[in-house]
Amino acid sequence: MSSKEQKTPNEQVSEEMEQQEVLPEAAEGVDLRDERIAELEAQLAEAQQHERDSLLRAKAEMENVRRRTELDIEKAHKFALEKFSGDLLPVLDNLERALELADKNNPELTAMIEGIELTLKSLQDVVRKYGIEIVGDTNVPFNPEVHQAMSLMESADHQPNHVMMVMQKGYTLNGRLLRPAMVAVSKAKA
């Protein structure tokens, strides 16, 4: 080195101090940048989590809508015949009444009675095929969901609160009540 290029000890010390002063300022800038980067990464992670949650909620909602729609379609198929079935019940009742009132001792009516019996049986088979069940048993506990009590009668032959007599049969369609059975209910003798 030439004498011009050589620095005095004071110059060297001041230059080193400047470098040391620059380093803390640079270090502070790096620290601020690192903090800002960490803050932005946290915000990004939070936004990504929020988006994931929103996506999962949307998927769950779509699945719920799909399930509800399937149930609605299934119910529509199951109970599409409800009105028609309700209109068919008086026909069943009339055929049963015709058989009850027919004079079975009259040989001239035998063929007609057999025809009504066959018609009633085939109609009952068809309605069962489509999910219509008859509610008309006696000696069963009274159930207000399927029975309508028309009268209470004392009876020693029947347990209390049991169906003694069916005045009009009831019907259900796939478990849903179309018409309650009109019944006489037993009560204990006083």
Swiss-Prot record:
A molecular-function term among this protein's GO annotations: unfolded protein binding
InterPro entries: GrpE, GrpE_coiled_coil, GrpE_head
Species assigned in the record: Serratia proteamaculans (strain 568)
Role of this protein: Participates actively in the response to hyperosmotic and heat shock by preventing the aggregation of stress-denatured proteins, in association with DnaK and GrpE. It is the nucleotide exchange factor for DnaK and may function as a thermosensor. Unfolded proteins bind initially to DnaJ; upon interaction with the DnaJ-bound protein, DnaK hydrolyzes its bound ATP, resulting in the formation of a stable complex. GrpE releases ADP from DnaK; ATP binding to DnaK triggers the release of the substrate protein, thus completing the reaction cycle.
Protein name per the record: Protein GrpE
NCBIfam families listed in its UniProt record: PRK14140.1 (NF010738), PRK14150.1 (NF010748)
Region Disordered: start-end pairs: 1-30
Family to which this protein belongs: Belongs to the GrpE family.
